[in-house]
Amino acid sequence: MAMTNEEKFKILADQIKITEHLDSEILENSELTRVDVKTSDRTWVFQITFPHFLTIENYLLFTGAIIEEFKTIADVKCNFTVKDKTNQDEFAIKYFSHCIDQTKLSPKVKGQLKQKRLIMSGDVLKVMCQNDVERDHFDKACNGSLIAAYQQCGFNISKVVFETDSAVNDGDLASLEAHIQEEDEKSAREATEKLEKMKAEKAKQQDNNESDVSKCQIGKPIQVENVRQIDSIIEEEFKAAVEGVIFDINLKELKSGRHIVELKVTDYTDSLVLKMFTRKNKDDLAHFKALSVGKWVRAQGRIEEDTFVRDLVMMMSDIEEIKKATKQDKAEDKRVEFHLHTSMSQMDGIPNISDYVDQAAKWGHKAIAVTDHNVVQAFPDAHSAAEKNGIKMIYGMEGMLVDDGVPIAYKPKDCDLKTATYVVFDVETTGLSNQYDKIIELAAVKVKDGEIIDKFERFSNPHERLSETIKNLTHISDDMLVDAPEIEEVLTEFKSWVGDAIFVAHNASFDMGFIDTGYEHVGIGASTNGVIDTLELSRTINTEYGKHGLNFLAKKYGVELTQHHRAIYDTEATAYMFIKMLKQLEALGVHNHQDINTSLSNEDAYKRARPNHVTLIVQNQDGLKNLFKIVSASLVQYYYRTPRIPRSLLDEYREGILVGSACDEGEVFTAVMQKDQSQVERIAKYYDFIEVQPPALYQDLIDRELVRDNETLHEIYNRLIRAGDVNNIPVIATGNAHYLNEHDAIARKILIAAQPGNPLNRSTLPKAHFRTTDEMLDELHFLGEEKAYELVVQNTNDLADKIERVVPIKDELFTPRMEGANEEIREMSYDNAKALYGDDLPQIVIDRLEKELESIIGNGFSVIYLISQRLVKKSLNDGYLVGSRGSVGSSFVATMTEITEVNPLPPHYICPECKQSEFFDDGSVGSGFDLPDKKCESCGCDLIKEGQDIPFETFLGFKGDKVPDIDLNFSGEYQPEAHNYTKELFGEDKVFRAGTIGTVAEKTAFGFVKGYLNDQGIHKRGAEIDRLVKGCTGVKRTTGQHPGGIIVVPDYMDIYDFTPVQFPADDQGSSWMTTHFDFHSIHDNVLKLDILGHDDPTMIRMLQDLSGIDPKTIPVDDKETMGIFSSPEPLGVTSDEILCKTGTFGVPEFGTGFVRQMLEDTKPTTFSELVRISGLSHGTDVWLGNAQDLIRSGKCDLASVICCRDDIMVYLMYNGLEPSLAFKTMEFVRKGKGLTDDMVEAMVDNEVPDWYLDSCRKIKYMFPKAHAAAYVLMAVRIAYFKVHYPLYYYASYFTVRASDFDLISMIKDKESIRNTVNDMYSRYMDLAKKEKDTLTVLEIMNEMAQRGYRMQPISLEKSKAFEFIIEGDTLIPPFIAVPGLGENVAQRIVEARDEGPFLSKEDLNKKAGLSQKVIEYLDELGSLPNLPDKAQLSIFDM
């Protein structure tokens, strides 16, 4: 049934939200008769019929609402018809002002007309004018347009007449016109207010609608049968449909107000970029916002080449979010995974442990283990993830187990080495397993008295075809073996030929394994002959060699080796090497076979042993500490190419640890391949559980021909299970997971491929995803259903139940103890306070000290203060200032104990003589350094100016219980001394560098991905490359150390209560050990001292040495020094000369282009303003787009904008906010959390201006005022030298802070240097980083030159190795300033010069080791005048 016009109107009224403003008659009886659509100019004309006239307010409201609703898609017009025109006269007058506005009259004419008196008579409207001139003017101007406007509103007006109004005088007319205008404006105002309210409600409703959209659905439904794999999208297409999971999303607003969404999706065959613009008048944006990474979508659209990304993209017409079935573990009884690698398995595991734990929890697993290679660095995150998911975490590691010593001689005999007979032999076989492979060639030579006296060479028939690998390796073909004798015959003959001689072989365990197994199978009795392994012998007596393979040793011993891997040739070469080795043994005093092992044993024997993988599982809390000790020892004491765990070490700390047999590289698996079952069972006895893994994880053994086939592999399973059963040891099935899902395998392939030396590159990587219970059962079905269930489910759950709950991270802070620390801190604070403020301390000083001491002592923080005080005191005693970082300057106790120079009290004067003081605590002064100079009224002495007005709460929190983080900036050259001093304070075994974990960065991952794809000859589009990069990013690559962090362990505990230890980046030559855990993981458990190295104290020390001026005596408010922060004039140069409007080049904190621009905008003149600028420059979203805009707009000045985090708390408290809320607000804002409703309410109630609230909302991070004050104090001192002692400053700057020198440019005249700088400015965007660094140096050099000083070339006679030296009005650069010349060479030049002058360039090269390139550079620089290429030989030298 067709919809009536009345129903159409109701729908329209509802859509434009106008129904509540219309009376019921209008709503019920109005009609929408039609809508005329003109596509040519996007015009919609609504034809509407009303039962009677609307009030002008409702008319304006209605038309405004309909235009607002459709404005984004059409230019809307309305034509109205009114059925009942009974009140037309009355409404025509009220509509007059609106109708005038619809004409094209000038604003002036419109304004005049609106004031006129009207008379309505029938269908004629009369407009009464003041005079004839006015009448004629209006009549001509309107020209029918007013009639059209009335008719559009539904009026039946046929004529508008302009008449002269003679009925009223001018005064009455003016009054009438004013009344008319007032009424018109009132009606328009009311309509506008209602419309704006409707708009606001609509916007709010849209926001609500957006928040209600939880699932994206735009456009038409997409047929599933049309969906294709993304890898099939290879060219432009009119229409295609794909589905995939979102791995990246970018939603941005365009200048037009529309939005564009860019999705990167993958279906794991490939990836594609999907794009879509929001459509006008649609809620697409809400749907876009419902999308997120990890959601699956189905999309349809046009495939086109995007000119910007130069790749195929889909321009979507339709998109819908879909539910994708995820893998479930549907087994009723779930397994427990005991072998799993995370991203902490270096360049091998992919996911974070939390990803595994989340998956296990979703599958319903009750527990899960983590067993990374050689490390336990995932433990902290594992603990957090397990607690979050309510799952039991089992902590473990896959380590490298080695025997403490590998024997050189087997079956020792009391036999003189010099007179013994030796049989040097070699076997070629069908494979590497003496249990499953066969001997195909046996060759030997007999050695006596240093000579080969006999040979033995036989093939044997294996009765099977050789693999291509064996043929290529041994150069033996099947034809060569067809007529060969049986192995029984060969071995029987061989045993007889050998007699009681001593066997010698290279890697004897392999060859003897085949001989012993062969003798046993043939039944001719076990061999009792002694054995010498030349591989292990060489490793012991040739420790200087990095390799010990047969090829390498043959060259070293001068022995010819042809056709390597043919038994007879290998044997002869080995024999000749062995003869020479015997002479080495004799030289070492080894004369008897039974003495070889004992005489040649050494502490490094573990290095020779072949590592076997082993799984170590923590059973209880004691086991955790023991594992920490094992990990530490393997990384520190027993590291050789990889961390190693000697068996004796494991035995010593085995309590509380369950030992598992690990993977195919474990000892038990290897034994199955190389030894008989009785030996396997004996070896298995050492373990607490035996592991078997799915056949897919052993597939590479078959691929590499180490295992013959699946049948052989199944036999290996049975022997492993038998070894467990015989010893009553549980056998468990483990997954050896390295990634979460099958499709993540590519990321591991890429990482492995990025490591050329990784042995995994030799084979196809096995499928190592995290398996469900049913997957494991299915893959082990060949064992039988019952046995598979036992290994996969029952035994893993039983083993998990034996493991206690273990907590790897402490939940409290353990600080070191220092006897009497509380009393010492209190006494020191008051003693120094009295020394500064007098015995009768001001109440403000007492109150602040007591407030702080109560928190410091009450929370056990005294020792932290005392440690910092000792470190600072030692540095000061040794002549180096210490700068403070962070918020420590907020603590007055820190000031009084000389930890920081920053005084946080309100600005004040102090008399150094009579100790009178005057405080300004009303916020009127920003810094005590800004107070005017003043003399003491009592004694006339110049008053000291102090105080930065910083609340204590910003350091230890509002309750004073936040652990203090005292960061100290020591001189970079003094930092090692400060670090070592902590060893004196606490003991070497109580202090460690804070460890860090370096992961694969996005840029590095991109290189890995591109390299892999190029090597494989694969082309992938950009979206897929981005996905692969994400998969590789975040994987552990190395370890390191915090630049200044020192971890202090209390004397009542040891480091293993918190973390294992290691060397940074496994550098065994490092002088410091680091925490194994990333220091953030234990930040709340142990004290961390931040003893950082910084250039400022080093530069201050050099300036002090050059000038003899104590930096503490420098006036902080020196006017000329302050002047350079707004102008270069105090330096005696102009802005044009140095190309800068300030004089702060090279001044710490104020020399960068970013901060110099801030200085230009703010023009600071005081210390407090510099502190504010420092805060602004170090914050995030504090200056740009925030304070800068406020200052430039004139709304604020530097003094009023938010600069440092403390500003917020202080300002809000001054404005009346309750202190705890002011503190909470500061904490929220400085961390980028914005403002809560209660904060906003309190701020508004206390009349905090709107701009302040907006500024707070924009801030992401804020700098502490104390940190800024400390930095600025150092900066002003250095700036003082720049102004008053220029050459001292420039010599110090170039020596301490500068690098990347362009000496060729620096030695030129000032105009040339200035031109060079100007030229680099013009090309700045194209400069490489190194060029930009050079530009920084040249800016300083230009300034120095403009001030009348110059740089000399390097002088062979005068230049130092590292320091710039002053000579007159010039500087002489050091040798280190030469590009590409390192520290060692720079020092060597000076040492060679001290031995005598350089006679020639050749002599310079010979004595100092300078390259030809460096010599040429020095020559170009003019540093080698008159130095010949070669020395001339004098007659007196002959």
Swiss-Prot record:
Domain Exonuclease: 422-578
Cellular localisation: Cytoplasm
GO molecular function: 3'-5' exonuclease activity; DNA binding; DNA-directed DNA polymerase activity
CDD domains: DEDDh (cd06127), PHP_PolIIIA_POLC (cd07435), polC_OBF (cd04484)
SUPFAM superfamilies: PsbU/PolX domain-like, Ribonuclease H-like
One BP annotation, GO: DNA-templated DNA replication
Broad class of where this protein is predominantly found: cytoplasm
Catalytic activity: DNA(n) + a 2'-deoxyribonucleoside 5'-triphosphate = DNA(n+1) + diphosphate
Keywords per UniProt: Cytoplasm, DNA replication, DNA-directed DNA polymerase, Exonuclease, Hydrolase, Nuclease, Nucleotidyltransferase, Transferase
GO annotation, cellular component aspect: cytoplasm
Keyword Cytoplasm: yes
Pfam families for this protein: DNA_pol3_a_NI, DNA_pol3_a_NII, DNA_pol3_alpha, DNA_pol3_finger, HHH_6, PHP, RNase_T
Role, per record: Required for replicative DNA synthesis. This DNA polymerase also exhibits 3' to 5' exonuclease activity.
PANTHER family attached to this UniProt entry: DNA POLYMERASE III POLC-TYPE, DNA POLYMERASE III SUBUNIT ALPHA
NCBIfam families per the UniProt record, alphabetical: dnaq, polC_Gram_pos, PRK00448.1
Similarity-based family: Belongs to the DNA polymerase type-C family. PolC subfamily.
Protein name: DNA polymerase III PolC-type
Gene giving rise to this polypeptide: polC
